A protein has these predicted regions:
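Short, charged/polar low-complexity linear motifs in solvent-exposed/disordered segments
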Residues: 93-96, 142-143, 148, 198-200, ...
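Helix-centered, glycine/charged polyanion-binding patches within enzymatic domains
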Residues: 111-184
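Basic, amphipathic alpha-helical segments enriched in Lys/Arg and hydrophobic/aromatic residues
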Residues: 160-220
Length: 220
């Protein structure tokens, strides 16, 4: 559904505008089941844009896989969506599904998940959310982030103990490793099938292989 273009600024006298529609997150907050939450998430082919670790924009067409992983680089939950879907739109279903499968303590997420609804949902499930701050064009928040970075460097320089949150947040890299395994070791870097069901099936087999492979490593 295409959104009508609106003129910038305040509406003219007598001009009426549609009320702001509730976000996907605010709708999901009121839902009980994962199936209901995912009914709001598109799986159609779309265009995705993200910023890589070097600060460059990457653009791709298709979909993306949202993964929840635990220690040992073991994927627990994976949800496929359109490439254009914002990561935060799948946060609540990921937390809910993963909580059904395993007991865990921390929800570690980057700045793309910085939302009060996600924090509250995580706490409701008995977890501690550790989510990076998204400055959202706020100079005050940027200053706060910079101050935290400066303090972190000082603590490292003097070899002083830091907040355990920093240690836990750094463990978020296990999801990146799962993505790496999926692309480099299990043939999911480029998928030429058409249709969300076929693509999601290929990715699901890849996730299953990683889960078995990493679990065997822990046993042996």
């Amino acid at each position: 559904e295409k959104k009508p273009k609106l003129k910038r600024g305040r509406p003219k006298k007598g001009e009426t505008r549609e009320a702001i529609k509730p976000t996907i997150l605010s709708k999901q907050k009121e839902m009980q089941t994962t199936k209901e939450m995912l009914s709001l998430v598109s799986t159609e082919c779309g265009v995705g844009i993200k910023q890589n670790s070097k600060g460059n924009r990457e653009v791709w067409i298709g979909g993306k896989l949202h993964i929840s992983a635990v220690d040992g680089d073991i994927p627990i939950t994976a949800i496929y969506s359109s490439a254009s879907v914002h990561d935060s739109s799948v946060a609540l279903p990921l937390i809910q599904e993963t909580s059904k499968k395993v007991n865990y303590l921390y929800d570690l997420q980057d700045a793309g998940y910085d939302a009060d609804i996600i924090r509250e949902f995580s706490q409701k499930h008995g977890h501690r959310p550790i989510i990076d701050i998204n400055p959202k064009n706020s100079q005050a928040l940027r200053d706060k982030i910079q101050l935290a970075e400066d303090e972190k460097k000082k603590f490292e320089y003097f070899n002083l103990p830091q907040s355990s949150d920093i240690h836990h947040y750094n463990q978020r890299s296990m999801v990146e490793r799962v993505n790496k395994y999926l692309k480099e070791d299990f043939g999911c870097n480029t998928i030429y099938y058409q249709g969300a069901t076929k693509v999601a099936s290929v990715l699901a087999f890849g996730i299953l292989c990683i889960c078995i492979n990493q679990s065997l490593k822990m046993v042996t």
